[in-house]
Amino acid sequence: MDLHKFKELLSVPSKTYQEEDMVEYLCDELEGIEGVSFYRDEMMNVYATKGTLEEGEFYPMFISHTDTVHTKIDKIVVKEEKLKRPHTFGKTFDDTLVDVLKAYDTDGKPTGIGGDDKCGIFICLELLKQLDKVKIGLFVSEETGCHGSSKCDVNFLQDVGYITQYDAPGNHLISEICSGVRLFDRDSEFFEKTLEVITESFGNEMLVQSHPYTDVSQLKKKIDVSCINMSCGYYNMHSVQEFISIEDVKCAIEAGKNMVKVLGLKKYEYLYKPIIYTPKTIMNSFVEDLDQDVDVFGFQDETFHRLETIDVYEEKDGITLSDAYEDGFLFIPDEDLVSLYEIIKERLIKKY
């Protein structure tokens, strides 16, 4: 692992919507990697490919996002320090000191290092260098609603066999559900092999959890392959106390390499299924009436319930459905839920 190159990347400012410097830096880096072809689209997303496939092969694809939430400053000073061994969200479980990276401004004040998701970017670049056949995607403006990945070049995905995103904190997280999208089937060869590889690479038992939103959920809607999001070594994200565990980044790189060794250049299909959030009182009706392969989760809230939008928007019974929320969810008053349920049910029957 080239620590100097990692620190160089971390020093490039990349606040959301101000990512030009980072994109230029990445294109310069890609120019120097032998055997790699790349391009950027009109959104400034960057796509890179290495190696030529044989008949029946598919590329593994690794992705991350180029933006951070931190205020853009002229110069980010990255320093190596030692902290107690971190666990997710900065909690410690022993007194062992480990090497970490932290960021400061030129006045010596702590600032966000942007490990979310510069760790992911660095890991993707390292895998591009070390693997023979691979694709990577680096997407802009994830932090404000996955704007880059939602408008990605779908043609780039057509020969991809599975997708891995590096955009979870710590060293023991795997995202199964993201933005109302299930990324993989737990009862599958893909997950069985991936879980074993990631667990061995990090040396931790992995926690399979839900992630609020990130780019892989947008790609999953566009391609019917298994996807996953995993930890990549940043802690205390979105704060000036953010730091990066160097060892965890190394483990994440090894996890990616080992995934490709074990999974190979195969396609691991998994059909996109929306997850519908409904009041518990009508959740059973959804399951019984639809008899479809749709995941249904229910929960109660005092004022509002949450339902995922299903691509088509219309007016019916005085209810206007729109994609006003960037994360793909609507907030619907209780009194509208009964008639809304009929609309959703009708759509799902047509769609599936």
Specify the residue positions occupied by each region the protein language model found:
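Short glycine/proline-enriched coil/turn segments at helix->beta-strand junctions
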Residues: 2, 31-35, 42, 55-59, ...
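A non-catalytic alpha/beta surface segment that caps or lines the substrate-entry region
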Residues: 5-8, 12-56
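Active-site metal-coordination/substrate-binding segment of hydrolases
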Residues: 57-133, 143
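Acidic/histidine-rich catalytic neighborhood of metal-dependent amide-processing enzymes
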Residues: 109-186, 208, 216
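An extended, acidic, His-containing surface patch that forms the Zn2+-binding/catalytic region
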Residues: 178-223, 272-275, 296
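Zn-dependent metallopeptidase/amidohydrolase metal-coordination segment
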Residues: 207-252
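His/Asp/Glu-rich mid-to-C-terminal helical/loop segments that flank catalytic regions of hydrolases
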Residues: 236-292
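Positively charged, low-complexity terminal tracts
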Residues: 287-352
